[in-house]
């Protein structure tokens, strides 16, 4: 009987230690935004792509985030692709299953181009995430970016502001 009691106490103690370790891993899971850069390219520089995006918005097959559907489309030279590259760091001892980003639009922004690539971050690693929006050419690149990550099926998010 005494041996079973010792085994039970040891098992419960081991279980508690494991729960504390798993809790520590989960609670310290954090994705940090290390750097954000932006580049603007005229939509006229890739006219075919602009026309494909425009056609997909008009016929309702656009895959991405449509902020607003223009009533009257202007020439491609009146729009700019703003590309944001976000440098992320996974500070956790567990890999991040999936990472995605959304740009919080300003009035006038048209759409965010969808990405079907599943991006993840290995444990204690860094990586880049790129998002692209279509906006009027006279806009500024200052935007809020929301990075959402998933660890063991639970989501977390980080907000950052590009520019000022």
Residues of each region from the PLM?
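Asparagine-centered strand-capping/turn motif at beta-strand->loop junctions
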Residues: 86-92
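Short, solvent-exposed, Trp/other aromatic-anchored flexible loops in extracytoplasmic proteins
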Residues: 110-146, 150-154
């Amino acid at each position: 009987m005494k041996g079973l009691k010792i085994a039970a106490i040891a098992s419960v103690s081991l279980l508690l230690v494991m729960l504390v370790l798993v809790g520590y891993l989960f609670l310290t899971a954090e994705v940090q935004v290390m750097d954000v850069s932006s580049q603007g390219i005229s939509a006229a520089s890739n006219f075919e792509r602009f026309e494909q995006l425009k056609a997909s918005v008009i016929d309702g097959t656009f895959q991405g985030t449509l902020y607003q559907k223009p009533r009257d489309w202007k020439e491609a030279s009146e729009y700019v692709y703003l590309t944001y590259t976000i440098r992320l760091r996974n500070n956790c001892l567990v890999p991040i299953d999936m990472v995605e980003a959304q740009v919080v639009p300003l009035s006038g922004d048209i759409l965010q181009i969808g990405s079907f690539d599943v991006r993840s971050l290995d444990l204690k690693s860094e990586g880049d995430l790129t998002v692209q929006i279509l906006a009027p050419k006279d806009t500024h690149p200052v935007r809020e970016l929301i990075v959402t990550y998933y660890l063991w099926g639970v989501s977390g998010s980080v907000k950052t502001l590009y520019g000022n």
